[in-house]
Swiss-Prot record:
Biological process terms in GO annotation: protein refolding
Gene Ontology terms for molecular function: protein folding chaperone; unfolded protein binding
Post-translational modification, as annotated: Under oxidizing conditions two disulfide bonds are formed involving the reactive cysteines. Under reducing conditions zinc is bound to the reactive cysteines and the protein is inactive.
Database matches in Gene3D superfamilies: Hsp33 domain, HSP33 redox switch-like
Compartment(s): Cytoplasm
UniProt name for this protein: 33 kDa chaperonin
S-S pairs: C247-C249, C280-C283
Chain's gene name: hslO
């Protein structure tokens, strides 16, 4: 199934639910950046979380940036997600791999906190005009889900549950995605409802398996996870929104960035290398500028 995002309400409209499937976007990010299993999972989770946060923005041009700055071997992470369903991202050390840890039940997991180390999660909301607004929280578990929930609680004072997950079989990514459940502003004082949501979330185990079961029918994920909350799909034009890995870079933008180096440095590049190669961090696309193009750019100063 193609990547998509769906919205619903629950508990008579008092709880907002959003789910996103990012399997194909994850595969595209992995291909472009030559990601390891560990970094594929971490970037996938961050892209999914970014799309969930962006889905609540009021303007269609709104975008959310998730950035991890820390002292661990991951060497940082950066995701840019839009209300329009586009997402892109990269990690500082794409080849990083850590040994899997085996539980007493025979399951395996990565130590995400070992990958991130100590540091901060920055979330920036940009509505396309005025100054973007950034909030910062300390990294907790490093697995993205709990860190985003911490951000929502401490920076936006929103009681939320965030689930992220993926399924890997025979070295292939079968599915990836995330879900968020939030108490709506009209019910934030309803302690009974808050406790009910908390209890329902505690019952959820193996989110990734639920995601796998719903990957061909994403709306069914809500009823699988919250049968007691009577979830109802929101029927609007942009529900069941298409999601894709899409970068906003272009050759023109790359040329504009090159001009920022200044005339003298561009002359030095032309004399020494006869060309310039620009690589987009977000999508790894390479833009080559030849000697004649460099001369033209220099002539514009």
């Amino acid at each position: 199934m193609a990547d998509s995002l769906v919205r619903a309400t629950a508990a008579n409209g008092s709880i907002a639910l959003v789910a996103v499937l990012t399997t194909e976007s994850t595969k595209e990010a992995r291909r472009r950046h030559s990601l390891s299993y560990l970094t594929t999972i971490m970037l996938s989770r961050a892209m999914s979380a970014g799309l969930l946060l962006a889905s609540s923005m009021k303007v269609k041009q709104g975008r959310v940036t998730i950035k991890i700055q820390s002292d661990g071997p991951l060497q940082g992470l950066n995701v840019d997600a839009g209300r329009d369903g586009t997402v892109r991202g990269y990690v500082g050390n794409p080849s990083l791999e850590l040994d899997l840890i085996k539980t007493s039940q025979g399951n395996h997991y990565f130590d995400f906190k070992k990958a991130t180390g100590k540091g901060y999660l920055h979330v920036t909301r940009d509505i396309g005009k005025g100054e973007p607004f950034t909030s910062t929280v300390e990294i907790e578990g490093g697995g993205i889900g709990e860190d985003i929930a911490s951000y929502l609680l401490h920076s936006e004072q929103v009681q939320s549950a965030v689930f992220v997950g993926e399924i890997i079989e025979d070295q292939e990514f079968i599915c990836s995605g995330a879900l968020i459940a939030q108490i709506l502003p009209s019910a934030v004082e309803n302690k009974t409802l808050i406790n009910l949501l908390d209890e329902e979330c505690k019952k959820i185990t193996g989110f990734s398996q639920h995601l796998l079961a719903s990957k061909d029918n994403l709306p069914s994920l809500f009823s699988h996870l919250f049968p007691n909350l009577n979830p109802k799909i929101i029927k609007t034009m942009d529900n069941n929104q298409s999601i894709s890995f899409k970068c906003r870079c272009s050759r023109d933008r790359s040329i504009s960035a090159l001009k920022l180096l200044g005339k003298e440095e561009l002359i030095e590049i032309m004399n020494e290398d006869k060309k310039s190669e620009l690589t987009c961090n977000f999508c790894n696309e390479i833009y080559n500028v030849n000697e004649q193009e460099l001369k033209t750019i220099i002539g514009e100063f």
